[in-house]
């Protein structure tokens, strides 16, 4: 490294996280260059934000620390074709997700430090919290410490994002990758969306109005998740009725029982042994035929059409200040 405390940083990618990282690090006093494909969709945005934007191959040449903040499935080719041939000796390679390294799709050069820094929040939140003087918690890991200073640089980077204002927790590439994938698949995305769809179907098939079903199983979910977010499950239970609490206690375990937990363990096993990643890479390389089919099925689920109509009347969602001037009986969903 050319500077032990203030490395020259190249941010490769300028999506939600890339933009937040670049802006926060620059505001923290770092020399930041953004590496993007010339003429790409985010080049003008980065330039408008005041960054020097060059091709990734140029950005990495003089950087002490290179942060790869592109989508997972383009990182292997990007590293092999652009980053590895051009990164200077002894620099630090940083990831925000460990999938490619942990599952051996990327084998970093032996002379590089290799670390991970992952804010636990979307890019917009990472930026917003930084701007108001707070920060989003970060996790970090060291995969390869050639210089003996890899951990220091991971912590410096996390601090530059604002993570030190909140909380920084050490992990490993293995732990971050496997728990992140499991959370997405079994709970946050796959589990939650399948639970909502199933609940909607049960109510509609029992003869209830689709609009009422939507409100009960999807719309009100935000109220519960916000309470989870603020204070855990116990806070949620404090703010719902005793009837809802009792229903939670007696019916929750009927829906999510030992057999559900066993299947969740199967999901985790497929993640741990690389089956999921192997299948995902094969799917991507085949042109995403199943992914496209699954996505279309979700788009065509009845809950989507119902939700679209109901959300059109939720003026707070689209920034409108008042509902359309129509008689009250015409405003009903």
Curated annotation (Swiss-Prot):
* Superkingdom of origin organism: Bacteria
- Describe the reaction catalysed, as an equation: (2R)-2,3-dihydroxy-3-methylbutanoate + NADP(+) = (2S)-2-acetolactate + NADPH + H(+); (2R,3R)-2,3-dihydroxy-3-methylpentanoate + NADP(+) = (S)-2-ethyl-2-hydroxy-3-oxobutanoate + NADPH + H(+)
Kindly name one Pfam family recorded for this protein: KARI_C
Residues annotated as binding Mg(2+) 1: 180, 184
Quote the SUPFAM superfamilies the UniProt record gives. Answer: 6-phosphogluconate dehydrogenase C-terminal domain-like, NAD(P)-binding Rossmann-fold domains
What keywords tag this UniProt record? Amino-acid biosynthesis, Branched-chain amino acid biosynthesis, Magnesium, Metal-binding, NADP, Oxidoreductase
UniProt-annotated binding residues for substrate:
241
Co-factor(s): Mg(2+)
What residues does the KARI C-terminal knotted domain cover?
A: 172-317
Q: Where does Mg(2+) 2 bind?
A: 180, 216, 220
Pathway, per Swiss-Prot/TrEMBL? Amino-acid biosynthesis; L-isoleucine biosynthesis; L-isoleucine from 2-oxobutanoate: step 2/4; Amino-acid biosynthesis; L-valine biosynthesis; L-valine from pyruvate: step 2/4
Q: How is the cofactor bound?
A: Binds 2 magnesium ions per subunit.
Q: Name one GO biological process term.
A: isoleucine biosynthetic process
| An annotated GO cellular component | cytosol
Residue numbers binding NADP(+)? 14-17, 37, 42, 72-75, 123
Which residue ranges does the record assign to the KARI N-terminal Rossmann domain?
1-171
Q: Where is the active site?
A: 97
UniProt-recorded Gene Ontology molecular function terms: ketol-acid reductoisomerase activity; magnesium ion binding; NADP binding
EC number per UniProt: 1.1.1.86
PANTHER family in UniProt: KETOL-ACID REDUCTOISOMERASE, MITOCHONDRIAL (PTHR21371:SF1)
Family of the protein in this entry: Belongs to the ketol-acid reductoisomerase family.
Task: Please explain the role this protein plays, according to its UniProt record.
Answer: Involved in the biosynthesis of branched-chain amino acids (BCAA). Catalyzes an alkyl-migration followed by a ketol-acid reduction of (S)-2-acetolactate (S2AL) to yield (R)-2,3-dihydroxy-isovalerate. In the isomerase reaction, S2AL is rearranged via a Mg-dependent methyl migration to produce 3-hydroxy-3-methyl-2-ketobutyrate (HMKB). In the reductase reaction, this 2-ketoacid undergoes a metal-dependent reduction by NADPH to yield (R)-2,3-dihydroxy-isovalerate.
Name of the featured protein: Ketol-acid reductoisomerase (NADP(+))
Origin organism is Xanthomonas oryzae pv. oryzae (strain KACC10331 / KXO85)
- Gene label: ilvC
């Amino acid at each position: 490294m050319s500077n032990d405390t203030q490395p020259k940083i190249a941010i490769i990618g300028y999506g939600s996280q890339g933009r937040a990282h670049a802006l926060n690090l620059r505001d923290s006093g770092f020399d930041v260059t953004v590496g993007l494909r010339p003429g790409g969709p985010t080049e003008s945005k980065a330039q408008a934000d005041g960054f020097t934007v060059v091709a990734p191959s140029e950005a990495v040449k003089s950087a002490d620390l290179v942060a790869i903040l592109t989508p997972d499935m383009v990182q292997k080719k990007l590293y092999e074709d652009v980053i590895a041939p051009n990164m200077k000796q002894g620099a630090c390679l940083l990831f925000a997700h460990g999938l490619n390294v942990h599952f051996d799709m990327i084998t970093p050069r032996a002379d590089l430090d290799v670390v991970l820094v992952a804010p636990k929040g979307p890019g917009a939140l990472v930026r917003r919290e930084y701007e108001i003087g707070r920060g989003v918690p970060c996790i970090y890991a060291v995969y390869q410490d050639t210089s003996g200073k890899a951990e220091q640089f991971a912590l410096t980077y996390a601090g530059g994002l604002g993570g030190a204002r909140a909380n920084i927790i050490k992990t490993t590439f293995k732990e971050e990758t496997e728990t992140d994938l499991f959370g997405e698949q079994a709970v946050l995305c796959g589990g939650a969306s399948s639970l909502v769809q199933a609940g909607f179907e049960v109510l509609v098939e029992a003869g209830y109005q689709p609009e009422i079903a939507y409100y009960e199983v999807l719309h009100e979910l935000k109220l519960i998740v916000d309470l989870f977010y603020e204070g855990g499950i116990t806070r949620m239970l404090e703010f719902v009725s005793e009837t809802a609490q009792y229903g939670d206690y007696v019916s929750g375990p009927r829906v999510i029982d030992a057999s559900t937990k066993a299947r969740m363990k199967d999901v985790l096993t497929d993640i741990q042994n690389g089956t999921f990643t192997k299948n995902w890479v094969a799917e991507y390389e085949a042109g995403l035929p199943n992914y496209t089919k699954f996505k279309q099925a979700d788009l065509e689920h009845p809950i989507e059409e119902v939700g679209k109509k109901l959300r059109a009347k939720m003026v707070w969602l689209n920034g409108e200040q008042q509902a359309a001037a129509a008689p009250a009986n015409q405003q009903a969903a």
